[in-house]
Amino acid sequence: ILKKYIQNNYSLNVNYRQNDNVGRRFTLDGGIQNLQNRLKSSLVDNICYDYDMVNAHPSIVLYIIKNYFKNLPCNYIAQYVNDRKNVLVNNNIDKFDILKSINVSHKLKSDNPWLLSFHQEITNLQNILYEKLKDKFVINSKTNPKGSLLNKVLCVLENHILHTAESHIYEKYNIYPDSLMFDGLHYKINNIIDDLNSCTKIYGINWDIKKHSLKIEIGESPILPQIKYEDSYLGVKEKFEKTYFLLLSPKVLFCRLYNDNDGLKKMMSYYQNI
């Protein structure tokens, strides 16, 4: 990625693809989106702001139920979306427990009463979506089809919300995002939180700037011991090639020998089966 970036005068146009032409947009041929978090943070720190949808998938779940399936119970889902921090602390769970609950349809291996109640509400939504949409999506999972379908629906809506945000910012500021981050965007400007919140309010999505907190600390370059040329790779290679060479076809290694009697250089082949 960095080589391409340098070769293109420190600018890299990135194309995106979608699995089955729906849902999230993934970079083609590399991009900042694919990098490990610490490396990504180190490269974009002080250059781009990482705008992130707060609590994206749970918020979209609540939006779906409130707007399309109003008869489904969603008390626990609403609790989590509206008071995430306290729900996590009070019930001794973390956000990964929530995301797992959303994405699986089998019974949770947990005895946490709050989490089990949350998952029951999710299961109700999974069941009804599966019956309505199972012929509309490609579902590759045989062991978790309902959870897989819900995830696809969430990613489709997530991408629609991302498009909405991109379009709104472009219309107002005439700028495109520097990169797409699934449920977020990179921009060089830092004053657009209110704009993002206003254009995605209908979906119950708020935005925040994610801090680049996992940077790689680069210290001083280590002082390496001086290596004599004859002991370096190039020196050893040069010395080796004065005596040996390899014929690829037929594969034979030749060694140069010296005749003490007449002083003439002669060749000997060996290692016929290397």
Predicted regions and their residues:
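Catalytic palm active-site di-aspartate
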Residues: D50-M53, Y176-K188
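Short basic/aromatic active-site micro-motif
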Residues: N92-K95, L99, L149-E158, S179-F182
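Helical catalytic core of nucleic-acid polymerases
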Residues: D20-K146
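Common nucleic-acid-contacting/processivity interface regions adjacent to the catalytic cores
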Residues: I1-S42, L246, R256
